[in-house]
Amino acid sequence: MDGCFVPLIKMVKGWNRERGWPIRSFHLETMIYEHYKNYEKAYTYDSTLKVFFNDLPGYLRSPCYDPVTSDRLDGYLDNGTNPTKRTEAIEKAERAASKTSEAMEYTEAGKEQKAIEIWESLLGEFFPAYG
């Protein structure tokens, strides 16, 4: 992913912050790293985010381990409340996946301004400057 990895993490963390921090920071970083560690070339941010958000609900349904210590990182999501934090995080990730698809459709239809509005609402202040 070359130099795209840190900005990508910042954008996904921006989404997380805008949603009330449903996923702990290191847990999120670990999922992003695991998702993209084998990518050999950089893609556009919009397509990269779309793929990640489409896969994020599945990652949230599975155990996640610290790559160094092998400690479980996602136990906080199962806090015994109803609905669990895991369910809430998955629902937020599914909505994000839907929004990224919608933004991509607007881009493909030549409606960049509408796509930008969706990205801004999704990523907050971490949406890259446009223009």
Model-derived regions: residue spans:
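Aromatic/basic-lined ligand-recognition segments
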Residues: 1
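Conserved nucleotidyltransferase catalytic core and NTase-mimicking acidic/glycine-rich helix/loop elements
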Residues: 4-130
